[in-house]
Design a protein with these regions (language model features):
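Glycine-rich, aromatic-bearing surface loops/beta-hairpins
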Residues: 167-209
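C-terminal motif of bacterial Sec signal peptides marking the signal peptidase cleavage site
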Residues: 41-43
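Bacterial N-terminal signal peptides that target proteins for export
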Residues: 15, 19-33
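Bacterial signal peptide processing site
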Residues: 45-47
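Central antiparallel beta-sheet cores of small beta-barrel/beta-sandwich binding domains
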Residues: 72, 76-157
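N-terminal helix-cap/turn-to-beta initiation motif at the start of protein domains
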Residues: 52-68
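Sequence-level preference for short, compositionally simple segments enriched
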Residues: 50, 88, 94, 168, ...
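Amphipathic hydrophobic-ligand
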Residues: 82-88, 161-166, 190-194
Length: 209
């Protein structure tokens, strides 16, 4: 009788069933939650340069990128840790609507780099952006106080090279100050970023000369 009562009143099977139902419910709720996140994410449109069309001061490429400029920034790894700093001199000019940005970089470890951008108008307000270490050409678009530039950069890696996708987003905060945030990705994964400020140096010679 004692054994029968013990078997009938043993709480473990009930606990197991309750726990099993709870876990099943949790799994379903978790799946529903993740599904909701996916739906919400898919419904969010990416930020476009046109979202800033009403922002001021208005960025006119031929006005800001004209004459000597300087750039000062940091390079971060994928975790957001600063791994390099740099300063740069830029000489900008325009001829027949085509822009040239001649950039000289000096990094904190002594490395020097030069990049020459050629900006060719596409006829729709955007520009084709070409440079020696850029694969193909990038696309530059501007609206309001903003400039977006997307391109594939080929960078040295050991004895070879690696191509990374760069998303430059620049914002004019005053007539002489442009903020630039760059995101670098490989296979869709973020591998690093660059934060920098570009300053107009009207009337001042480029310091690299």
């Amino acid at each position: 009788m004692h054994k029968l009562m013990t078997a009938r009143t043993n709480p473990l099977p009930t606990i197991r069933r309750t726990l099993s139902c709870y876990l099943q419910g949790f799994t379903m709720s978790r799946k529903m939650f993740l599904g909701l996140i996916v739906i919400l994410a898919s419904g969010c449109s990416p930020v476009s340069v046109n979202d800033y069309s009403a922002f001021e001061p208005r960025l006119v490429l031929q006005d800001f990128f004209s004459g000597p400029l300087t750039a000062h920034g940091v390079v971060k790894n994928r975790n957001g840790l600063v791994i390099r700093t740099f300063n740069a001199d830029i000489q900008a000019s325009w001829t027949d609507g085509i822009g040239t940005l001649d950039e000289y970089f000096l990094f904190d470890d002594g490395e020097r780099q030069r990049r020459v951008w050629t900006l060719i108008p596409n006829g729709d307000g955007s520009y084709r952006a070409e440079a020696g270490d850029v694969v193909g050409a990038g696309r530059l678009q501007s609206a309001g106080n903003s400039l977006f530039l997307e391109y594939v950069l080929r960078i040295p890696y050991g004895e070879s090279t690696v191509d990374v996708t760069v998303d430059d987003r620049m914002y004019l905060v005053s007539q002489a100050v442009l903020i630039n945030e760059s995101s670098m990705k490989k296979f869709g994964f973020r591998v690093g970023s660059i934060d920098l400020v570009i300053l107009r140096q009207a009337g001042k010679p480029a310091t690299h000369q």
